[in-house]
């Protein structure tokens, strides 16, 4: 039995993994696949790939490309979701900001540096024509940290997946003032180089199951 650990955010995108695990489809192929939730997002998963805490990650395209370029010993083996990810731009419900163009000098809540919330804030700033070097960030760890930072006034806006944050918009915690879709496929599957070298066929089996 081969042990493999897969990382992903606890969001609807990864429901197929929960279903295939529940159905014991990996065990039937002599693979003990374990799922690990990463509420901290892509930055946390990139770190986990580096340390060997996980073997496979369902990770944001922009996050893993940046980290591989910075030395992460992993490879992208396939696209997981081809459509763009829609990043909502959120402020506190009581904020004076009314549109995303107002946010040039505002403090941005991010889960961590190198995360999707960090990189997409840069993409949004670039699209708005702002000076990237002058962006101000507040590291908050995860979605709950973003909620707390906006409610407590520690940051001015927070970018997170549109539909994941919709309940917080609906109940009046956040106010969404814009969206910023990624100009690339949103999620890819990344695997540590060591795992590809030693368990390539098992990785192929995992991908075949999740793609079916």
Which residues fall in each region the model found?
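Short, glycine-/small- and polar/acidic-enriched structural segments
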Residues: 2-130, 137-140, 156-162, 175-181
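Short, surface-exposed acidic
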Residues: 132-135, 200-201
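Pocket-lining segment of extracytoplasmic ligand-binding domains
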Residues: 144-212
């Amino acid at each position: 039995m081969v042990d493999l650990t897969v990382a992903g955010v606890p969001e609807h995108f990864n429901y197929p993994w929960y279903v295939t695990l529940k159905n014991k489809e990996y065990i039937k192929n002599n693979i003990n696949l374990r799922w690990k939730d990463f509420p901290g997002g892509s930055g946390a998963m990139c770190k986990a790939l580096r340390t060997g805490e996980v073997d496979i990650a369902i990770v944001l395209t922009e996050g893993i490309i940046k980290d591989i370029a910075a030395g992460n010993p992993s490879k992208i083996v396939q696209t997981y979701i081809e459509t763009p990810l829609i990043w909502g731009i959120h402020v506190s419900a009581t904020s004076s900001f009314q549109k995303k163009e107002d946010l040039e000098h505002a403090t941005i809540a991010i889960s961590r540096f190198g995360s999707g919330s960090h990189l997409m804030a840069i993409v949004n700033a670039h699209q708005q024509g702002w000076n990237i070097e002058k962006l101000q960030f507040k590291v908050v760890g995860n979605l709950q940290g973003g909620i707390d930072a906006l409610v407590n006034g520690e940051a001015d806006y927070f970018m997170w997946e549109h539909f994941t944050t919709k309940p917080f918009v609906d109940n009046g915690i956040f106010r969404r003032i814009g969206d910023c879709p990624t100009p690339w496929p949103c999620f890819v599957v990344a695997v540590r180089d060591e795992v590809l070298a030693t368990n390539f066929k098992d990785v192929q089996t995992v991908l075949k199951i999740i793609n079916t």
